[in-house]
Amino acid sequence: MGKITLKPTENQNYILLGGEFAKTLDFAHSQESKGDFEGACNTRYKAFQQIVEVLPEEEAVELDFSHQNTRAALEIVYGSAVDNFLAGDVELSTAQLELLLECDSEDHIEATPQLALCYIALEEWECLEEILPDLGDKSAFKPLVEALAEYAHTGEVSADKLSALHRHRHLCDELQAAEHVADESYLRDISSERPTQQALAREIYLRCEPLLMKYEGFIGKLR
């Protein structure tokens, strides 16, 4: 990969030089397309370790999302955080996402929803409350997070949160489906320019699956 350096720009932020992160990101995607999901996770995590090594420990630095190599590095950090969340290492995933938001304060990659899942898993309710306003109001993700958080916290889901979630029919159908297969058809759909509502709903389910398995009684509250 060559030497990786952090270079300041005229826009009061930084870019990452070296590392060929765009190629690394493409390689991880190609591994996934061939079914080598473990290999893709390892590729992303190794690159994440290289990225962390050049970031200063004592202060946060804003990275330039418009710079291709730097943007790819941020996407790698996000992808690795998702990998670790799905693998059950929630604390590492949380640390990665918090680092990502420090480096990308405008949250171009939309890491906040994934961080919300981490906070629910860790039962960090105050941290969750702080970031809830940053979740998009139009997305089906926010009502799901709010309903799931309430269930995780209290064992119940209030009528208003159920009502908000039921407005998103495709997601509710997916949550209650017998199977949630990430097959070739789904992968083609979700990677297209305009994914179907069904594919988007499945993507949300798959991202939340560890929590839905942990709080298995939640799905029953939707019926």
Where do the model's predicted regions map?
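Long, ordered, amphipathic alpha-helical scaffolds
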Residues: 148-223
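Residue-level signature for tetratricopeptide repeat
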Residues: 30, 76, 83, 117-118, ...
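Structural motif corresponding to the intra-repeat A-B loop/turn of tetratricopeptide repeats
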Residues: 34, 87, 122, 153-154
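Solenoid-like repeat scaffolds
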Residues: 12-17, 49, 66, 98-105, ...
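Alpha-helical repeat scaffolds
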Residues: 5-12, 42-46, 90-98, 124-136, ...
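Boundary/linker segments of alpha-helical solenoid repeat arrays
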Residues: 51-59, 105-112, 137-146, 167-181
